[in-house]
Amino acid sequence: MFKKKNISLAVIRRLPRYLRYVEDLLNHDVLRISSSELSQRMGYTASQVRQDFNNFGGFGQQGYGYSTQVLYENLVKILGLDRNFKMVIVGVGNLGQALANYANFYKKGFRLIGLFDIDPQKVGKTIRDIKIEHIDKLKDFIKKNDVDIGVLCVPADVAQEVADIMVEGGIKGIWNFTAKEIEVKGDVVVENVHLIDSLMVLSYKLNEKLLEKERIK
């Protein structure tokens, strides 16, 4: 598959949305769609849609548009969803438990194979048939099972320490839900998720609407 180098993060962040939409089209037996139709429904320009896809080879045919099946298959490969990445969650509090029970991970091909915590009241219990192990076993578990992704749901003050254990075990990527910006060595990939940031963006949008109404009065 052709792929340009240095694809912008903005393009990459649009890919999951494309995938969700194309998946919905397939579920409704829509076999093809044009870039203009896709752009109108998603709120992008047709030019932007074409440019996004051209980063990876295009996928479309002039005069035909895009086969939704071909588009879906390519997006799955681009996003690596066909690799069935193995994951562990460290920190099985409210957020960790919610993530462990999130069925979409399995539907999208991610395999949750381990849960870890330090709380003796949680260790030994199971979620979705996965036994919660003590964090002391984390490094060896990652090595033995060649785990790809570590999901970090621990308190911020221990986030770096746990991330270091993951890296020592050979983790390839860390999905960080803590408030701590962790540092990693080597080629480990980190994706930080700050839930409060999204809420503050919503707050900004609501505030702008209220300010606009106040100006009109």
Curated annotation (Swiss-Prot):
Modulates transcription in response to changes in cellular NADH/NAD(+) redox state. Residues 17-56 bind DNA. The keyword Transferase does not apply. InterPro entries: CoA-bd, NAD(P)-bd_dom_sf, Rex_DNA-bd_C_dom, Tscrpt_rep_Rex, WH-like_DNA-bd_sf, WH_DNA-bd_sf. Its main location: cytoplasm. GO terms for biological process: negative regulation of DNA-templated transcription; response to redox state. The lineage of its organism: Bacteria, Bacillati, Bacillota, Bacillota incertae sedis, Caldicellulosiruptorales. Belongs to the transcriptional regulatory Rex family. Homodimer. One of its GO terms (molecular function) is DNA-binding transcription factor activity. It comes from the Bacteria. This is Redox-sensing transcriptional repressor Rex. NAD(+) binds at G91, V92, G93, N94, L95, G96. Pfam families: CoA_binding, Put_DNA-bind_N. It comes from Caldicellulosiruptor bescii (strain ATCC BAA-1888 / DSM 6725 / KCTC 15123 / Z-1320) (Anaerocellum thermophilum). One of its GO terms (cellular component) is cytoplasm. Keywords: Cytoplasm, DNA-binding, NAD, Repressor, Transcription, Transcription regulation. It is found in: Cytoplasm.
